[in-house]
Each structure stands twice: as C-alpha cells, then as structure tokens.
C-alpha cells in the first residue's frame, strides 16, 4: 500500500484503508493485519520526523465508532513504540480516521530523537539477541564515538562474579566444541546457551530460510557485545547433536549464503581502522554407525570494532515529495545531534 501526500496547507499523509476496532482487528487475517499496521505506522513515523500534520486513512468497517470500539491493541502498541514521548490525538470524521501530530521540540530547542519503528541494532542480553530501543542505541553509539571505537575484547571485571565465571566456562566449552572435526549422532554436548553461545536444531527442509531469518540479528548481537558462537544442528531441548542432512541444505550453499548475509549487514564506524565483520564458518561432520549422516554448522563471530546493524534502521521522513527511508548515516546524525 502506497502512502500519498495530499496537497493541503497542512501536511496530510494518506495511508489508504484500514480496519479499526479492538475486536475487529483481532478477527483479521494475520497477513492483512500486519500489512495495515506496517503501512499506517510507516506514515506516522514519517510525519513525526517531518514536523506536524495528520495521517489519514479510510475506515473499512462501516459501523466503526472511535469512542466505542477503540483503534486496536496492535496499533496502540506500534504507535507507542515509535516515539513514546510524542503525544498523539486520534479523531474520526465520518468514514475517515485521523492521527494528529503537533510539532515537538525539546526544552533546549532541538527536535529530539528520530521517530523509529525499529533500530535494527542488537545486543546480547543473557541467552537472547535483543533489539536496542532508541535510548540504548543512542547511548551505545555515543560511547563508541567518544572512545573512537571498541577494543577487540571486553575488559574483564576486576572481581568477576559467579555469573561472569559461568559464562566464561560455557564459552570455553563452546570454543572447544568449535575446534572438533568429527561428531557423533545423538551424543550429548555439555554447554548451555549464554551471552556468547546460541544453538538451533532446524531439522526442516526450510533450513536455509530459517538461518537467513535469524542470522542478521544474531550476528549483530554477538558483534555488538563480546562476540560468540552460533551452532546449527544442536537439539536445544535434549542437548544432543543431531546435525542437518545435506539433502535439506548443501554445506557449500549454506556457507555461501552465510557469507553473503554477513557481508550485506550495515555497519557504522567511529574508528580509523574501519574493519569488516570478522567471523569463521565451518561444517563439522556428524557420524552415525561409522558413516557421515549430517553436519553441524559452526559460526564464530568476533567482537566488532564499532556497530553492526541487522538491517538499516526503519525510520522514515517526507522528502522530495514522497515518503523516504533514512539512510543509516542520516539516522545516526539525527539520533546523535
């Protein structure tokens, strides 16, 4: 769905049609609900970054009343996540829905942070890859800028606690596993997932698709934290080696896609070296009854010198008569201005 700009004294972004109401949106097909949400959220994001005005959408359901039915839980969540501090005013005029946005300025006269749907900047939090919110992303990038980059390895604590020692032990076990050249089907492995270790089984014909889905955020998170290991072909539930069969995905094909994916990840530098993402990918043969039956894909990602994004930040503005996505350079400049 295209977003059009209406020629009026006030900036109006027309987001097309939308189904509104808490119950009505719950009964929608998931694909349609996501697409409508994405489109009107994109329009709102662009408007917030372009001053003031209105987002306009034609209401699909004819019996809708804003004061009675609400707008929809998914829309409320998405709108709040763009820029929580920005007040919004919802209005209905006949069969049209309006989101009114007033120009916002900080007390110091600056325009504040860019409204953003997704920073696409990840870090590790425990055993998970977590997207940074605007505040965390700003703090992370400013620290790197002040320091002129990040050291190749994290400085250890003077007195590491039990959690730090446990994570170090897990990483040592994962490093030893990474060095293996031969594995045995159904054999147990002795390390858990942690800040530096993640593993997946992906026993499916859609292995390549699943890897491509998780790889950007996992690599971004490891690179932006302290590096780490991703293993494909390990059963999370039973902590057993299962591997993946070559018929589901040839190792060379998977390796090529991993390389392509990592090289396409956006990065930003505040250092002089401007290095590329450092990683190593290998395939360990899995044996059963003496014969090779599957493979484990082992990926080691090094701590990055600056910042790695899973994708360009999803943030929009009105430019040259249309709704345009900020480049990563524009977004960072806006965020840190």
Question: What annotation goes with each model-predicted range?
Answer:
Residues 1-337:
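Conserved N-terminal catalytic/coupling substructures associated with nucleotide/phosphate chemistry
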